[in-house]
Amino acid sequence: LFLVLNLGFLVFWVIFKFRYVIIPFLGFVMGFGPVRSYTPFNVTHSTADATMKVLSYNTWGFGKFPLITRDNTILQYIKKQDADIVCLQESYLTEYGVRVADTLMGRNYPYQDECNEGNGGLRILSKYPIIRKIPINFEQPTTNLACAWLLRRGIDTMLVVNCHLQSIGITDVEKADFKEMVRGTLSTDSSRIESHKLLWRLGSANAQRAGQVKAVMALLRKFPNTSTLLCGDFNSS
């Protein structure tokens, strides 16, 4: 929106009063950093041979399909990306689903492991040997998960951490009520109730997520000199 408005003013001043072009120009200069951070326009270029490609994906149970097949769009996408390391969240599969996924991608990823306590369903697919799995324990009971793996890449050892942290957990009904509240179509009393409910959910989720982050950080501090890759669905956007 900032770019569009600023560009519009730039065109306007070019046509009607050229000397004022400096105003939107300064806007572009001052806003370059934030815009570049949130809208990273990258020029395609060839990658070095030593480049490592990583994919992190919350599959949502591979689309919540009752029966996963080779044609599953998420499986096909993962295969097409051909990443060196794949970290998946909510990747719980039946035994049949595991066989289907292995048939489709097992040749690409000879090293695989999972962490399936609760409903988190963390999975790692790797082209590098897995040396060791390190579960990360959260203090509060939860269905969320975090797990780490040590991989051997050439002569180096690297730590890969895969997380699925606490979400706010807003229901579809609450989302609809919140939209009405924002639009101003919800009654005053209902708006007050919904705002309190939302604040409570935000506070509760953030408190739980903070504890989970501490557990992940505690593990990372145990490997200060190890190359580390941190992936996951952090539910904090």
Predicted regions: what is each one?
Residues 1, 15-17, 61, 93, ...:
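Alpha-helix initiation/capping motif
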Residues 2-45:
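Transmembrane alpha-helices and immediately adjacent membrane-cytoplasm interface residues
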Residues 18-22, 51-54, 88-93, 111-117, ...:
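Generic detector of short, locally flexible boundary/turn motifs and exposed helical patches
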Residues 29-49, 66-67, 75-79, 84-181:
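Structured beta-strand-rich core segments of catalytic domains in phosphoester-bond hydrolases
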Residues 56-71, 169-205:
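Acidic/histidine-rich helix-loop elements
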Residues 53-59, 74-98, 159-164, 201-202, ...:
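Active-site beta-strand/loop signature of hydrolases that rely on acidic residues for catalysis
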Residues 49-52, 74-78, 189-194:
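Short amphipathic alpha-helical segments, especially helix-boundary/capping motifs
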